[in-house]
């Protein structure tokens, strides 16, 4: 069955839907950010990954390509936290700060992973600062 001209114009071109644009915009923001920052042994990169359900944080030394410490909302003690996802993000921030201190890390470079500094990302960063990490 042939499509009329009106039906063709209503189709959204491939790659132009909202979710694809949002994903590509996030990737562009993260790429721009990664051009400017890198983690060292003295000041590793605090990488944050956010999914719709969980939050992951890692301390990465980019000079040798190793993860120094990690924390995630998948861990049992974080899952046990009552409250919303922001409260769990705060707990992940506290955990990563404690693990960084145990590894001898005082200062970090914050890599928000292309996400807006808002909500869970901001809660994690604030909790890490309160835990003693310097950004």
From Swiss-Prot:
<keyword id="KW-0689">Ribosomal protein</keyword>
<comment type="function">
    <text>This is one of the proteins that bind and probably mediate the attachment of the 5S RNA into the large ribosomal subunit, where it forms part of the central protuberance.</text>
</comment>
<comment type="similarity">
    <text>Belongs to the universal ribosomal protein uL18 family.</text>
</comment>
<dbReference type="GO" id="GO:0008097">
    <property type="term" value="F:5S rRNA binding"/>
</dbReference>
<dbReference type="InterPro" id="IPR004389">
    <property type="entry name" value="Ribosomal_uL18_bac-type"/>
</dbReference>
<dbReference type="InterPro" id="IPR005484">
    <property type="entry name" value="Ribosomal_uL18_bac/euk"/>
</dbReference>
<protein>
    <recommendedName>
        <fullName>Large ribosomal subunit protein uL18</fullName>
    </recommendedName>
</protein>
<keyword id="KW-0687">Ribonucleoprotein</keyword>
<dbReference type="GO" id="GO:0006412">
    <property type="term" value="P:translation"/>
</dbReference>
<keyword id="KW-0699">rRNA-binding</keyword>
<keyword id="KW-0694">RNA-binding</keyword>
<dbReference type="Pfam" id="PF00861">
    <property type="entry name" value="Ribosomal_L18p"/>
</dbReference>
<dbReference type="GO" id="GO:0022625">
    <property type="term" value="C:cytosolic large ribosomal subunit"/>
</dbReference>
<dbReference type="GO" id="GO:0003735">
    <property type="term" value="F:structural constituent of ribosome"/>
</dbReference>
<feature type="region of interest" description="Disordered">
    <location>
        <begin position="1"/>
        <end position="25"/>
    </location>
</feature>
<comment type="subunit">
    <text>Part of the 50S ribosomal subunit; part of the 5S rRNA/L5/L18/L25 subcomplex. Contacts the 5S and 23S rRNAs.</text>
</comment>
């Amino acid at each position: 069955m042939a499509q009329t001209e009106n039906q063709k114009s209503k189709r959204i071109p491939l790659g132009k839907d909202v979710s694809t644009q949002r994903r590509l915009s996030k990737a562009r923001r993260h790429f721009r950010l990664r051009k400017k920052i890198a983690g060292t042994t003295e000041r590793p990169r605090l990488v944050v990954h956010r999914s719709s359900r969980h939050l992951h944080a890692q301390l990465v030394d980019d000079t040798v390509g190793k993860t120094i410490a990690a924390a995630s909302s998948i861990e049992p003690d974080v899952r046990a936290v009552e409250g919303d996802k922001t409260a769990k993000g705060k707990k992940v921030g506290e955990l990563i700060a404690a693990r960084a201190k145990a590894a001898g890390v005082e200062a970090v470079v914050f890599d928000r992973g292309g996400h807006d500094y808002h909500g869970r990302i901001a809660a994690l960063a604030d909790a890490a600062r309160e835990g003693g990490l310097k950004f």
